[in-house]
Structures are given as C-alpha cells and as structure tokens.
Amino acid sequence: MARKRKTPTRDVLADPVFNSKIITKLINTIMLDGKKSVAESILYNAFAIIKNKTNKEPIEVFTVAIENISPQLEVRSRRVGGSNYQVPCEVSAKRKQTLALRWLIQYARLRNEKTMEEKLAGEIIDASNKMGGAIKKREDTYKMAESNKAFAHFRW
C-alpha cells in the first residue's frame, strides 16, 4: 500500500448518448477484451428492449435498479488475536455504485436468455422490481452483516 498520498481517481467521460457517467461505468464493466464498441451496442440494445417491455424511459428504470441493488452494509475480514472475524461495515458511495454495477453484470451473464442484450435488460427490469440475482446477492450480503453484528465493535 502507498504510504505517501492517496492515488487520484480517474474521472470517466460522460456517455455521449445518455450524457451520464454511470452509463459509461456500466459500459466499462460490460466490456471484455477491450471491445468497447461491442459493450456499447449491448447496452444500447438492452435499453431498447427495456423501453419496449416497460414503456418507460430506460435510464429511469436503470437508476431505480441501481438504487435497489446498492448495498448499505458489507462484511470485511479483520484479523484479531489469531482468528479472522467478518466485521460488518458501512459501504462508501463510490463502492456502492461499483458493487451494484458489478453484481448487475455478473448476474445478467448467468441468466438463461439467448443474447446478452436480453439478459442485461431482464436483469435491469428485475432489479427495478426488487427481484433477480443481483437483489438476492444484496440480501445475502445483509444477512452476513446481520449474523456478524456481534463483531461490529472491531470496526476500523
């Protein structure tokens, strides 16, 4: 770990279509092997599917989904006296967003639809309705934090 100073965070450019930084972060999370144009087409086609299925603005559905997925608490390992404890901690705003995007893509990839566009659209719609794999992951994270509440005094 660096001792001198905190590393500066790199600022991403806003998405040209939706003019949103979180959309750019989602595209970067979807991207595999540096193929950004493929990731962009996947996302924009998924948003078109969302618009057809819900008759709502896809950016609004996506925003609700991210709010529903974002965790407030998580557990972090802390070594105290020779044993490791899972200590519940609050999650920073930046990490909330990062975890939400990561879980959204992870559980979209595990879905059974045919194309990635359909998988992503389905997961976003499910997350906005408080269903789906990403929501289940958040609930599991909360259960872990709740069951380890006794170790909260080890927080740093």
From Swiss-Prot:
GO BP: translation
Record GO terms (molecular function): rRNA binding; structural constituent of ribosome; tRNA binding
Q: Which GO terms describe its cellular component?
A: small ribosomal subunit
So which domain of life are we looking at?
Bacteria
Q: Which InterPro entries match?
A: Ribosomal_uS7, Ribosomal_uS7_bac/org-type, Ribosomal_uS7_CS, Ribosomal_uS7_dom, Ribosomal_uS7_dom_sf
Q: Which UniProt keywords apply?
A: Ribonucleoprotein, Ribosomal protein, RNA-binding, rRNA-binding, tRNA-binding
Described function: One of the primary rRNA binding proteins, it binds directly to 16S rRNA where it nucleates assembly of the head domain of the 30S subunit. Is located at the subunit interface close to the decoding center, probably blocks exit of the E-site tRNA.
Family statement drawn from the similarity comment of this UniProt entry: Belongs to the universal ribosomal protein uS7 family.
Q: How does it assemble?
A: Part of the 30S ribosomal subunit. Contacts proteins S9 and S11.
Q: What is this protein called?
A: Small ribosomal subunit protein uS7
